[in-house]
UniProtKB/Swiss-Prot annotation:
Superkingdom of origin: Bacteria
Source taxonomy: Bacteria, Bacillati, Actinomycetota, Actinomycetes, Mycobacteriales
The protein's name in its UniProt record: ATP synthase gamma chain
Coiled-coil stretches noted in the UniProt entry, renumbered to this chain: none
Cell cycle as UniProt keyword: no
UniProt GO MF annotations: ATP binding; proton-transporting ATP synthase activity, rotational mechanism
Residues of the signal peptide: none
InterPro entries recorded: ATP_synth_F1_ATPase_gsu, ATP_synth_F1_gsu, ATP_synth_F1_gsu_CS
């Protein structure tokens, strides 16, 4: 059994760790609020550009490379979104597991998987396992901004536009010598953690390219008239320039904004996961201190009882010795 001094040392150590986890919990909580605010701030633009694309969908042929499913595709890019820091519970483990499942499905479908990773934890994971990574970007998982994620967005769009038969230009972050072109791909998938609530975050797969245009949760047909929720035909719009030209200009913007929204949502999910992990660690530390304190008190009581017993026994022995004299 541990001595009282050892127990007190453990209590001090656990309390010290508890202060750290509590501080991390509070920091993560404040970051969740900020991240949620950024997601909400980006929503109006995303909704408006989606609305414009819906209008264009009814007036254009939709014959655009970013919308076209390529027959006989050979290569598929997978972007795995992880965190730069740890202490986030199962956040990184879950998204890496989801990515492995996706890569297996793509390989079984005949695609060569081209892996890209954001976040230091994901980079370290694949490096430790000696698995190939075509490009890595770090330093913005908790606080993504438009400029920091520029090379990620542009490379994925350029690579898809080039297709597996063409080549995309080198960009910073790719694991190739500067200036060397990289072979393109026919699909782009993003594996990230979806923020549902403070307590729930789920790893999901989103097909970024080719774009799957959706109107009121239904895949629209080429040239289909838009109907309002009441079943009435929506007004006919005139576009200047023509709808196909506008679609050509807006689709890259839409894809860029969608990917940036994914980074923002992943940042919120990371902070929420870290907050939950740190809260659980703080609660466990509190319970452990209670248990250790109870054991220490019991040991102290036993020690005091033993000392009293020894004193009483000694006094009795002295008394008996005096009487015999």
């Amino acid at each position: 059994m541990a001595t009282i001094r050892e127990l007190r040392d453990r209590i001090r150590s656990v309390n010290s760790t508890k202060k750290i986890t509590k501080a991390q919990e509070l920091i993560a909580t404040s970051r969740i609020t900020k991240a949620q605010g950024r997601v909400a701030a980006a929503a109006p633009y995303a909704e408006e550009i989606q609305r414009v694309l819906e209008r264009l969908a009814s007036a254009s042929s939709l014959d655009h490379p970013m919308l076209r499913e390529r027959e006989g595709g050979k290569r598929a890019a997978v972007l795995v979104v992880t965190s730069d820091r740890g202490m986030a519970g199962g956040y990184n483990h879950n998204v890496l597991k989801k990515a492995a499942e996706l890569e297996k499905l793509l390989a079984e479908s005949g695609y060569e998987v081209v892996r890209y990773v954001t976040g230091k934890k994901g980079v370290d994971y694949y490096k430790f396992r000696a698995e190939d990574v075509a490009g890595t970007w770090t330093g913005f998982s908790q606080d993504p901004d438009w400029a920091a994620t520029h090379n990620v967005r542009r490379h994925l769009i350029d690579g898809f536009t080039a297709s597996s038969e063409g080549e995309a230009a080198w960009r910073e972050g790719l694991n190739l010598p500067e200036g060397q072109d990289i072979q393109g791909f026919d699909q782009v998938h993003v594996v990230y953690t979806e923020f549902i609530s403070m307590l729930t975050q789920n790893p999901v797969v989103h097909q970024l390219l080719p774009v799957e245009p959706v109107i009121e949760d239904e895949i629209f047909e080429k040239g289909e008239d838009l109907l309002s929720s009441s079943g009435e035909v929506e007004p006919d719009y005139e576009f200047e320039p023509d709808a196909d030209t506008l679609l050509e200009a807006l689709l890259p913007q839409y894809v860029s904004r969608r990917l940036f929204s994914i980074f923002l949502e992943a940042a919120a999910a990371e902070s929420a996961s870290r907050r939950n992990a740190m809260k659980s660690a703080t609660d466990n530390a509190t319970e452990l201190v209670k248990d250790l304190s109870r054991v220490a008190n019991q040991a102290r009581q036993a020690q005091i009882t033993q000392e009293i017993t020894e004193i009483v026994g000694g006094a009795g022995a002295l008394a008996d010795s005096g009487e015999s004299d």
